[in-house]
Amino acid sequence: MEYRLKAYYREGEKPSALRRAGKLPGLMYNRHLNRKVYVDLVEFDKVFRQASIHHVIVLELPDGQSLPTLVRQVNLDKRRRRPEHVDFFVLSDEPVEMYVPLRFVGTPAGVRAGGVLQEIHRDILVKVSPRNIPEFIEVDVSGLEIGDSLHASDLKLPPGVELAVSPEETIAAVVPPEDVEKLAEEAAAEVAEPEVIKKGKEEEEE
């Protein structure tokens, strides 16, 4: 699935002035391209809430170009917690590393026996050609008993998709009920914010 967003070239506009006007400064880049752009902040919010880092966002530019991209980084204002800069990675025919959502299906046998399913990862880092990007990867957990775990190597990847993480990475597990509280405390101690979201300004006020 892909989403579309109007983007405009930046021709000397200062980032601070663009933000005051309700625009979001950004950069679109790859190995062969590096160009400053901006998008409407409200429209970006709408699109990014749906696309996130998992789906292609096609930037529609004023010169008629439509460039497929992935959001690589969003810088947030520390105080207001709203985007103030975005990096778009422009896709080509070369394979790219990206996170693809995992869709868990089935009821584990261990859950029927009183255990609890822990979905440790909701997405997985893969290497894939832009033309083969899957909308999601289905994960069948119905065979998991209490104490069982499912690893990245167990995933049934679509054609053209390769793992970009260790095959031993744990994706899901069925645990006894008494272990749930301990796992919840450990999860709360970890950084909950996605790696793509960064706090603070990184672009100079030109």
Curated annotation (Swiss-Prot):
Impact after mutating R10A: Destabilizes formation of the 5S rRNA/N-terminal bL25 complex
Start and end residues of each stretch annotated as CTC domain: 92-206
Region Disordered: start-end pairs: 184-206
Phenotype when changing Y29 to F/R/S: No 5S rRNA/N-terminal bL25 complex formed
Note: Despite its considerably larger size this protein can substitute for the endogenous E.coli bL25 protein in vitro.
Described function: This is one of 3 proteins that mediate the attachment of the 5S rRNA onto the large ribosomal subunit.
Keywords: Ribonucleoprotein, Ribosomal protein, RNA-binding, rRNA-binding
Pfam families, A to Z: Ribosomal_L25p, Ribosomal_TL5_C
Protein's UniProt name: Large ribosomal subunit protein bL25
SUPFAM superfamilies for this protein: Ribosomal protein L25-like
InterPro entries named in the record: Rbsml_bL25/Gln-tRNA_synth_N, Ribosomal_bL25/Gln-tRNA_synth, Ribosomal_bL25_b-dom, Ribosomal_bL25_C, Ribosomal_bL25_long, Ribosomal_L25_dom, Ribosomal_uL5_bac-type
One GO BP annotation of this record: translation
Statement: the UniProt record of this protein carries the keyword RNA-binding: yes
Keyword Iron: no
Organism in which the protein naturally occurs: Thermus thermophilus
Lineage: Bacteria, Thermotogati, Deinococcota, Deinococci, Thermales
UniProt GO MF annotations: 5S rRNA binding; structural constituent of ribosome
Cysteines engaged in disulfide bonds, as pairs: none
Effect of R19A: Destabilizes formation of the 5S rRNA/N-terminal bL25 complex
Family recorded in the similarity comment: Belongs to the bacterial ribosomal protein bL25 family. CTC subfamily.
Subunit structure: Part of the 50S ribosomal subunit. Contacts the 5S rRNA.
